[in-house]
Amino acid sequence: MKKEFDFILIGRITIDFNPMDYYNNLENSSLFKKYIGGSAANIAIGLSRLKNKVGFFGSVSDDQFGNFVLNVFEKEKIDISHIKKTKDHKLGLTFTEMLSEEKSTILMYRDNVADLQIDVSDIDLDYILRTKILVISGTSLAKSPSREAVLKALFLAKNNGIKVVFDIDYRPYSWKNLDEVSLYYQIVAQNSDLIIGSYEEIQLTSRFCLENPENLIDDDYAKYWLKFVDLIIIKNGKKGSKLYQKDKKLVAKVVPVKMLKGYGGGDAYASLFLDHYLKNESDLENGLALATSAASIMVQSHSSFDLPDYQKILEFKDNALKSDPDLVQKKEWNAFKK
């Protein structure tokens, strides 16, 4: 069966306000630029710009900001047929504080937000069957009714042979407590095909299934999660990232750049890697090099979604490899060898 979509995403859509007078305290900033935000939204835009057919399960406010999101998505050629409008909820707002190249913070307004109002009745099996891959963003598990909608989408995809990617995307301000986070993350992770998360996010996901997870290293987590998934990526900020499969381990460094801000690389990383994973799964070394290159490009950018075209990323990656041929290294590994 020919698939209409390469990816369908489900997750967070927000409005970001980033200061133009940056390297300043937020209380002293007076000029901001508005962007679409939220990890799932940013990844969707990134994937679409990489010439993938992209759909989205979501919910936005029935007002000017909701219209702004839908207009951006349509401009970016993302299908909006399964993004509903809600009159009683507003989109989350994020104000960024860029204090220095190294330090950035955010001020978020996420009470009763629109993106968490997607309901089980909004999840359409026919829509899921039209995609090759379903991408779930972990923030969408934070509250009902979105939580149940995500679980429905997960099991419909799994039971119909659709690959599931879990981008953990932990945001503490959306959750009641850590037990709730770990419980729902574990359910989704154990039913996914691919997991992407930071070391801290993987640790949080593992609290109920591994003893003393705070004392474990990346390899330990990989050995456990590869019992369930085909591939896991563990990110460690400036230390780089690691990709694991049952018989493969790749270690990627970060490409050093002069940063504008200390965030925004993760969504570009996911976009480039997932694009390459779909189109050329046999060459994951190159996919990881592209992903880490895209992340370095984005921390130099003012927004989190303004991904440059593929050719610029390719040139950046090629130059990075010339400077450091060991940007991505293959390590000896077998997850289940005793």
From Swiss-Prot:
Highest taxon of source: Bacteria
Region forming the signal peptide: none
Key word Kinase present: yes
Swiss-Prot/TrEMBL keywords: ATP-binding, Kinase, Nucleotide-binding, Transferase
Gene3D superfamilies: 3.40.1190.20, putative 5-dehydro-2- deoxygluconokinase
InterPro entries reported for this sequence: DKG_kinase_firmi, Myo_inos_IolC, Myo_inos_IolC-like_sf, PfkB_Carbo_kinase, PfkB_dom, Ribokinase-like
Disulfide bonds: none
One example GO MF annotation: 5-dehydro-2-deoxygluconokinase activity
Catalysed reaction equations from the record: 5-dehydro-2-deoxy-D-gluconate + ATP = 6-phospho-5-dehydro-2-deoxy-D-gluconate + ADP + H(+)
EC number: 2.7.1.92
Pathway: Polyol metabolism; myo-inositol degradation into acetyl-CoA; acetyl-CoA from myo-inositol: step 5/7
Family, similarity comment: Belongs to the carbohydrate kinase PfkB family.
Main function: Catalyzes the phosphorylation of 5-dehydro-2-deoxy-D-gluconate (2-deoxy-5-keto-D-gluconate or DKG) to 6-phospho-5-dehydro-2-deoxy-D-gluconate (DKGP).
Designated name of the protein: 5-dehydro-2-deoxygluconokinase
Organism: Mesomycoplasma hyopneumoniae (strain 232)
Taxonomic lineage of the native organism: Bacteria, Bacillati, Mycoplasmatota, Mycoplasmoidales, Metamycoplasmataceae
The encoding gene: iolC
